[in-house]
Amino acid sequence: MVLQIFCGKISPNESEELNPMKKLTSLLLSLVLMVSVLACGASAKTSTKVRIAGLKGPTTMGLVNLLSMEKDGTASLDYDLQLYGAADEIVPKLIKGELDMAAIPANLAATLYQKTNGGIQVMAVNTLGVLYVVEKGNTVHSFADLKGRTILSTGKGTTPEYVLRYLLKKNGLDPDKDVKIEYYSEASEVTAQMAAAKKDAIAVLPQPYVTAAQMKDSDLRVVLDLTREWNRVCDTQLITGVTVVRTEYAKQNPDVIAAFLTDYQKSVKAANEDIDGTAALCEEVGVVAKAAIAKKALPKCNIVYRNGQEMKKDISAYLQVLYDASPAAVGGKLPDDNFYYTEPSVLRKVMAAIRNSAK
């Protein structure tokens, strides 16, 4: 209607005779056309780099093909992928707005949602279970054998800690009395400790660090697959990592989010199908030290892309288990529905496009 008035097809007086529904429909169509006109002549790819943080390890292995796509011109966006050794390095940057998105542990996302009063949203599940108990020796064959032992682990306050504690309790062990858990900030520190140990050392490690450690030390063996142990006592999906976005960024850039999720899905698909290419990228970017390690570990890393209702169902069930075991694991309370990113309405997209074009 707005464009029709401008073009002289409908006079202002005639436009007033349209019923409210027709007015609304005409207005929406006009807004869409206006956005299209504003977009004419602009590049299909945004010139703004999307700043994404990831941890060295499995949760970022599904992201690396974004860089390959960017190089060959098939990516919808430009990406600035930043790597960190520990999640607590990412959190302050995300809170300050120095990052747009991040791949972080699932429970940390819930905690951060509470801490920022809804300042982040989860867009996708990126990694399922990747944790294992490994031993340098042959004394552990079940959870019962862990009693009285020291366990080295990474991830205090995130998935490794809470999964280990949950499974110890489910198998009749008190994690505060029956075992001693020593935490290190990075998985690479744990593998170094295991390599230096003479015998009978025990650790909880994620892939690809399990593979890396075994390639260096043939005496290291996997004694417990924690995903299998989880499935034995729990009917929910074990989730290691999720990909989150700052809520304000998502509101202002719905088209960027849609383009990212399309690219991300392709990147994850490539990670599971093009093992050699992804392994080379993992070494190039620094996600894994050597391509040979990544190549052997990738099939065991449970890299996925799950969004929408499937994502919400899996994450909410997983967080419920953690909450029941320890409310602190998810920030003191379960996140509400706004925690889960959903595609905005057409009107919201149009208004965001108009707002951005005016900048």
Residue locations for each model-derived region?
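Short, low-complexity disordered leader/linker segments with a strong preference
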Residues: 1-49, 348-359
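Short, glycine-/small- and polar/acidic-enriched structural segments
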Residues: 45-178, 182-183, 207, 221-224
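A bilobed periplasmic-binding-protein/Venus flytrap-type ligand-binding module shared by bacterial periplasmic
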Residues: 65-67, 131-142, 237-256, 304-307
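Short, solvent-exposed loop/beta-turn-alpha elements that line the ligand-binding surface or hinge
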Residues: 70-78, 228-236, 303-311
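Pocket-lining segment of extracytoplasmic ligand-binding domains
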Residues: 107-108, 189-283
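Periplasmic-binding protein-like
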Residues: 125-135, 221-249, 299-300, 337-347
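Secondary-structure end/capping motifs
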Residues: 250-329
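Conserved C-terminal helix/tail region of periplasmic/extracytoplasmic solute-binding proteins
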Residues: 316, 320-359
